[in-house]
């Protein structure tokens, strides 16, 4: 069960978050069997839905944030969707987590280093620590940091101070893990911890 929530911050601002529950549904009532987990630790995956009667559990989200959707520079249209993601459950100790794998990722060209624009993907193996950063052509920047306990994404822009952002997620894999980064223009989708931690961030 996934829920799109509006959470009130201490500052009075709203935070838009998706979380999910693992449990049993008998056709009328859902019974959660464990605590809720965050679906996406970035800011640009909201109101995601799955498809009834599909052969697999496929998730598709709105790749924007109500916090700044009207401030992001745009022409002709203002709205994008995430890649479709195949969902499976994986148990880590006594908790079940959703593993998210982008559908059709093979069609994206593979690069060794991030590009400032265009469509590309990277596949990365990491262990205790990892760091990666790049900029778009208009100066928007993103930095990815991984340490023993956290996966952290920082977004910056030299002119747009409102674009500053820090997202943090807990590490779930002990030891070596894998990560896919998929870029489509200014939309970055990060699938870390073997797909157990996702972050969707729009650069602007």
Placement of each model-derived feature along the sequence:
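Beta-rich accessory regions
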Residues: 24-204
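Internal metal/ion-chelating core segments
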Residues: 1-34
């Amino acid at each position: 069960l996934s829920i799109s929530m509006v959470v009130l911050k201490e500052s009075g601002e709203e935070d838009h978050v998706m979380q999910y529950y693992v449990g049993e549904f008998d056709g009328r009532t859902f019974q959660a069997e464990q605590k809720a987990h965050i679906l996406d630790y970035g800011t640009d995956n909201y109101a995601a839905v799955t498809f009834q009667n599909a052969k697999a559990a496929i998730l598709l989200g709105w790749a924007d944030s109500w916090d700044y959707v009207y401030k992001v520079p745009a022409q002709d249209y203002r709205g994008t969707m995430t890649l479709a993601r195949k969902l499976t459950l994986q148990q880590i100790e006594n908790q079940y987590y959703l593993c998210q794998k982008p559908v059709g990722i093979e069609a994206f060209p593979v690069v060794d280093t991030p590009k400032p624009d265009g469509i590309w993907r990277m596949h990365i193996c990491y262990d205790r620590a990892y760091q990666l950063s790049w900029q778009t052509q208009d100066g928007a920047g993103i930095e990815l940091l991984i340490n023993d306990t956290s996966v952290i994404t920082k977004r910056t822009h030299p002119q747009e101070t409102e674009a500053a952002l820090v997202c943090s997620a807990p590490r779930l894999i002990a030891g070596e893990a894998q990560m896919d980064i998929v870029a489509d223009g200014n939309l970055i989708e990060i699938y870390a911890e073997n797909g157990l931690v996702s972050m969707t961030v729009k650069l602007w």
